[in-house]
Structure formats: structure tokens, C-alpha cells
Regions:
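Bacterial N-terminal signal peptides that target proteins for export
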Residues: 1-9
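Secreted/periplasmic proteins
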Residues: 20-160
Length: 160
């Protein structure tokens, strides 16, 4: 397992018609999976394009429990802000269902968050190099102490 730490990332969910709002978060990146070979196609992966979407049928339950800890997903991200660590997830989850019951693709611009409404759109800025990406939050996690968001492999790679 390879670990990469980055000093700071700024995460800002984008304001849309409903359910999303401005969110500020500070984070570092930790790589939980083996680092796959970086395919050339990743450079061309476009950021997620924010659009109004209904909440996912799955993943937005009033509460859920993982590893003995309870979480209450938000119905709206209005006024939300948080700081902490970001990690990325890749090959170990590639092709498996997300909390929205969509197939996880580590080469798309997606992310997982414990409580943001699914889906939400988040702008992530690496404040060390000012690189920014926009991701679509469609999964729950990370369920590791101190981590606030899991980025797809492509999202993390584009921020590096």
C-alpha cells in the first residue's frame, strides 16, 4: 500500500438549484489502495459537470451505522463546512456498486462522503499547487478515523 500525503486541499461543494451549497473543507490526500499505473487517458478526464439531480434512491437514508458509528446524511449541504483529510480509492473498489447503486469507476471524477447528500458536486482545490477539480459525490465513506472524503483515483491524480 502506497501512501501520499499532501499538506492541504480546499473542498467546496458547488451551489445548485437544490440540495447543494457552499462547503469549505481542508484536507490531505492519503492513498489507501495500491497505486495503479497511471494511464495516459487520465489526463483527458474532464471534471464532473454540476447539474440539478434528484437525490439517489439509495444512500440518503435518515441514518446508517458503519463499524459501530452512526451517521445522519444531510438533506441539504447549505451552510456546511468541515476540515480534515482526504483519501482516494481505486482498484479495490473499481467496478463495485456505490451507495447510489452506480458502478464505481476509478477513472471518473467522483467521491465519497459520510453525510453530504447523494449526489452532490464538490470543487476540490489542492492549496499547495492550486490545482482544482470538480467531483460528483455518489458514495459513502471514508470510514477511517480523521478522513472526510474519498476521491476517485483520477480526481486525486489530477490534484497531484
Amino acid at each position: 500500500m502506497q501512501t501520499q500525503l499532501k499538506p492541504l486541499l480546499l473542498l467546496t461543494p458547488l451551489v445548485l438549484l437544490s440540495g447543494c451549497s457552499t462547503v469549505s473543507q481542508i484536507a490531505s490526500i492519503i492513498a489507501p489502495d495500491d497505486d495503479p499505473t497511471r494511464p495516459a487517458r487520465e489526463v483527458a478526464v474532464a471534471d464532473a459537470v454540476p447539474k440539478h439531480e434528484p437525490l439517489c434512491k439509495y444512500g440518503n437514508m435518515p441514518s446508517y451505522k458503519v463499524l459501530g458509528k452512526s451517521y445522519q446524511p444531510m438533506r441539504s449541504a447549505v451552510g456546511f463546512s468541515e476540515s480534515g483529510i482526504a483519501s482516494w480509492y481505486g482498484p479495490n473498489f473499481h467496478g463495485k456498486p456505490t451507495s447510489c447503486m452506480e458502478e464505481y469507476d476509478m477513472y471518473k471524477m467522483t467521491a465519497a462522503h459520510k453525510t453530504l447528500p447523494l449526489p452532490s458536486y464538490v470543487e476540490v482545490t489542492n492549496v499547495e499547487n492550486n490545482k482544482k477539480v470538480v467531483v460528483r459525490v455518489n458514495d459513502r465513506g471514508p470510514f477511517h478515523e480523521g478522513r472526510i472524503i474519498d476521491l476517485s483515483y483520477s480526481a486525486a491524480w489530477k490534484l497531484d
